[in-house]
Amino acid sequence: MASEKDDGPALPKLDDDNQTAENTCKPAEEQPQQLRWDDIHLPRFSLKQGMIPTRYVMPWKENMKFRNVNLQQAEACGIYAGPLEDSLFWGYSERLCHGEDRKAVLKKGLPEIKITDMPLHSPLSRYQSTVISHGFRRRLI
């Protein structure tokens, strides 16, 4: 005869004092110590590469003519000359390695300039229609 009680394993009850229950119910913004999913960058290689791909450094990074002169001129002008994001090449395939927080990396460079207007006429343009420029302006609004 089947009993009316459930004979399955007893599950632990979640109390109000249980910290794990509180953490699972809170959104990510209210959890100060934990990382959110958009703060983490997991690099991926392509499937055609092996487990440990061969390291490749571009030749112009190793031996660039007048590199020291260019760095001195950039320092004199106050231009940041360091890498924003160092790109690694493994087996001739590029990937970006985020060693720093994404927001901190973007603050190093110049801000993006938003083009507010496109000229209505260009002597080099094949299509000299105002429809193209009006469509471009509509996207910026």
From Swiss-Prot:
Location, primary (coarse class): cytoplasm
Role played: Microtubule inner protein (MIP) part of the dynein-decorated doublet microtubules (DMTs) in flagellum axoneme, which is required for flagellum beating. May serve to reinforce and thus stabilize the microtubule structure in the sperm flagella. Involved in the regulation of sperm motility.
Known tissue expression: Expressed predominantly in the testis.
Organism the protein comes from: Mus musculus (Mouse)
Pfam family, one: SPMIP10-like
Membrane-spanning residues: none
Subunit comment: Microtubule inner protein component of sperm flagellar doublet microtubules.
Keyword check for Transferase: no
Protein name, entry field: Sperm-associated microtubule inner protein 10
Keyword Signal recorded: no
GO biological process terms on file: flagellated sperm motility
Signal peptide start-end: none
Gene Ontology cellular component annotations, sorted alphabetically: axonemal B tubule inner sheath; sperm flagellum
Origin organism lineage: Eukaryota, Metazoa, Chordata, Craniata, Vertebrata
UniProt keyword terms in alphabetical order: Cell projection, Cilium, Cytoplasm, Cytoskeleton, Flagellum
Loss of function: phenotype: No defects seen in the sperm morphology and the percentage of motile spermatozoa is comparable. Howevwer, velocity parameters such as average path velocity, straight-line velocity, and curvilinear velocity are slightly decreased in the spermatozoa.
Residue stretches of biased makeup (Basic and acidic residues): 1-16
Subcellular location: Cytoplasm, Cytoskeleton, Flagellum axoneme
Chain intervals for the UniProt region annotation (Disordered): 1-33
